[in-house]
Amino acid sequence: QALLAAGLGERAAARQRLAELLQLKFTTGAATIFPGICRLLPGETLLVERGAITARRRRAALPEGGPVPIGRDAALQRLDAVLLDSVAAHLRADVPYGLFLSGGIDSSALLALMRRASGSRVRALTVGWDGGGEADESFEAARLARAMGAECERLTMTEQDFWTLAPRIAAATDDPTADAAVLPSWMLGRAAASGGLKVTLCGEGADELFGGYSRYRKRRAPWRWLTRPPRARGIFGGAIADGWRDGITAAEAAAGQGRSALQAAQAVDCAEWLPNDLLTKLDRTLMVHGVEGRTPFLDPVVADFAFRLPDARKAGAGFGKRLLRDWLAGAFPEAGAYARKKGFKPPVGAWMAQRADMLGDLAAGHPALAGVLPTARIRAAFADAERSAQPAWSLLFTALWYGAHVLGVPPDGDIGEAL
């Protein structure tokens, strides 16, 4: 946003990048959605002298080579040491800090580690949804906080919050990510700031490094060579023209050398999904409130250890993050390390379904989507929002983002006014 305000970039969106955003929820590589503006890649350093780039260096995020054998007991002992060291380092601050507690494996592990590292009561925040529902784990998060002697503030995101805050949240994410988790993350950032917190610890990175996603388990299946790679079709399938997957294809080509199939899938996620969706979401939704998000699972020592683990200690037997779960079962039994978790996404599908016709009409005529998708497909996505939320949310977020950053629409009104 600063570059655009200074006149150093064009207030336009590259059509190929819009297609990528709709299909993947994020954009890949160095080129941003704004023509002429590029990202520094993770671990990259540029040396600029007299207005020109004279040197470029990049530190590899992940180690080379395949998994390294290690026994379960030795792995658990090593994991405990590297996690505790990382959390202790991430707690170094001269300002108040806290934790975003979702009730899942990752934030529960951080809760236990923060208590050990600091020896003091942890301040945690969690968020639930109006009406609750099976995807609301905020009460479970509050229970875990009590079990660990932590102070926990529970927020509630209502349907009205969705309609009024979504334009402001889209305006805060200059590098766009159509991940519905931007909504609760923004609310948590606002609550942290209003409560005097300047730093929060967050669980991003654990799934990518310890093998948490179901797509990783598929990479270990005997029939994996017969299946399509992750993100093969995109959110809208063949309705969007070819070319949107070029960035992922390039990452796949670079990720697999000398690695297991599971590691290759992890490496692609660490190269694209993690920095361009999850960490972008975290940075923009927190820093707009002046709050710093810290990610202990992404400590280089933790990342090196986790990525080299044998595949069987990451994914298998119906579960991911097996070693992390085994560690949590011993360190924090109340967390239910092998219980099924429900995720951290608000019921945007049900909320959009309440005004599906209005949203479909407004989105179908929006300049952000013109020529990218047929209008009939846009309307169909909103008509089906309650059953399948992501397509409709991707369309809505993209239109809101385009309005704020390209058209200059003020984000102060509700969704209907912003569109």
How should these model regions be labeled?
Residues A5-E10, P35-P42, A52-I53, E64-G66, ...:
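Adenosyl-5′-phosphate
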Residues D73, D130-F139, A181, G293-L298, ...:
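Active-site metal-coordination segments of metallo-dependent hydrolases
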Residues P167-A171, S194, R215-K218, W351-Q354:
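Short low-complexity, flexible loop/linker segments enriched in glycine and/or proline
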Residues E208-G234:
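A mobile, often basic/glycine-rich helix-loop segment
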